[in-house]
Amino acid sequence: MAENSVGANERNRLRRRSFLTRAGAVGVAGLAGCLSFDSATADGPAEELIEEGFATADIEPPFETTIAITQDQERNRVAQLLQSTLNGTDFFDVEIESRDFGSHIESMLSAADTEENAIFVSSWTGGWDPSNYVAMLFHSENQTPNGLNVGHYENETVDEYIDAGLTETDSDDRVEIYRNLQQELVADSPASFVRFREATHVWDGDVVSDWQTYPLQPGSYYAVYAPWAGVYTDLEDETEFVGDLGSDVSNYDPVKINGTVSSQATALVYEQLVGVDFDGEVQPMLATDWEQRDATTYRFSLREGVQFHNGEKLTATHVKRSFQRYEGTTRESDVYDWYESSTIIDDHTIEINCKREYGPFETALFNVAIVPLAAIDGELDLQEEPIGTGPYRFVEHESGNHWRLRRFDDHWFTGDEAVPATAPIETITLEIITEQSSRQAALERGDLHFSYNLPSASLADFERDDAYGVGRRVSGGFDMILYPCYLPPFSEPSVRRGCNMLIPRERILENVYHEIGQVAYTPISPLLEDYAGESFQQEIADEYVRPN
């Protein structure tokens, strides 16, 4: 998105926009008079906004539409609450359609092209940088099918903020940009942000000790052994750890991985120049240290003696060619949105040149796996055998059954006061179990040592049972309702805004998720506290979401 970035003067203009003041925003108190239809009359500020939008779009209520969800009990209950709320206004006649996960994703990607009349209940997992929560979903360049802007939402100011946030490197200025961006999104409401999710981990307390909960789901199994983060897990009288995956592993190759489960499965196989630890701090991994040489150039010193699982020894050439390998792939934007070139100084020193100043540079490196030259040259297919430098190496994948790794005894880590030189767990077996209830039953039978994202209603029981350990922390995920901005009446901001005000967030959190998570009004997770603290959330809610 380099061509859409704004210059310094424009960024300053964006930063100077006062917080919680938006020119042209539809204010709740600003509606005068009462528009009416034969079939519906507005009751309260939210419905007045909807009524205004219906009149502008020349839509006679009730408007028939569908809430599209995946086949999931919790999602179905959310949809039922939303259906009841919208139908209760008499402006909508809503039905619910559930689809298997694959069909749901396909319909989202094609919705705008087919002008599908549907509201999508979905979720998103961000990361350690605020751009992860907004760019793919709301930048006009990222409209489906090539991006994930499902509603084909367009807002020039939103685009400017997203681009400015990426090029800004001053931390305070980035906070202001992303807060203003979130304000703009809530005011325009291309989506309703409903709940910040929690990372919830449950383990057999008689077997697993010292488990730590990583807040982002792709890193669920870093707790097994992540010496770069100062973390490891031991087992009581066992050497095989048995966990689970919520679906099958579809891709092994880093340049093809586009799903959370594939990332979970390969997280201990591949490594990057740096890692982001359990507290969000950037830590050395394959790089021992680095320095910024100028605004767009960084020099990295590589760890010596690092061996790939196929016997290759890590050099700067591996790093340069691993970056180049992303070009022309489905993960190209992970690198080539900011990467310009690399210069090899010597075998263990490399300079990385960015196209422009890039705010999330260090966290972006955590997305770029370093792979062996055999894979880059085509002698090795990582889709058949994933090979990296990680503490565990691939053993087998029995599709629909399990994924298995074994300890890599030639891993580079030599031990320190916090983490032993050798991972205590020899074998990791991840059973592929798609149903939440089946995963819970397997854990209770003792077939699993660990599971994640179990039904919310069950967590309280596990927390009361001394036989289990439970880890809960706010994650990088949020639940949302995506509106078809390409289709009247949802093309009208006032309709979307009115619907956003009506979402029964507290009831959803309490009745569906049993208080697991937090009510959300904005997209950026409280995991990034500076960008989404509680007081900021409340200011946004009071100004734009709460009807009174």
Located regions from the model:
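Short, well-ordered beta-strand elements
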Residues: P62-Q71, V94-I96, D237-D248, N258, ...
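Aromatic- and charge-enriched surface segment that lines or borders ligand/interaction sites
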Residues: T288-E332, P489
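Ligand-site clamp/hinge motif
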Residues: F91-D93, D100, G305, Q383, ...
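Detector for C-terminal structural segments
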Residues: A2-L14, F19-S36, E74-S84, I105-F241, ...
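Short, solvent-exposed loop/beta-turn-alpha elements that line the ligand-binding surface or hinge
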Residues: D43-G44, E48, G53-E64, E106-E115, ...
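Surface-exposed binding/hinge segments that line
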Residues: E291, V335-I376, E385-E398
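Short helices/loops that flank or line small-molecule/ion binding pockets
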Residues: Q80-N87, G102-N117, G311, S437-L448, ...
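Alpha-helical secondary-structure segments
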Residues: S39, F63-Q73, T169-A187, T315-S322, ...
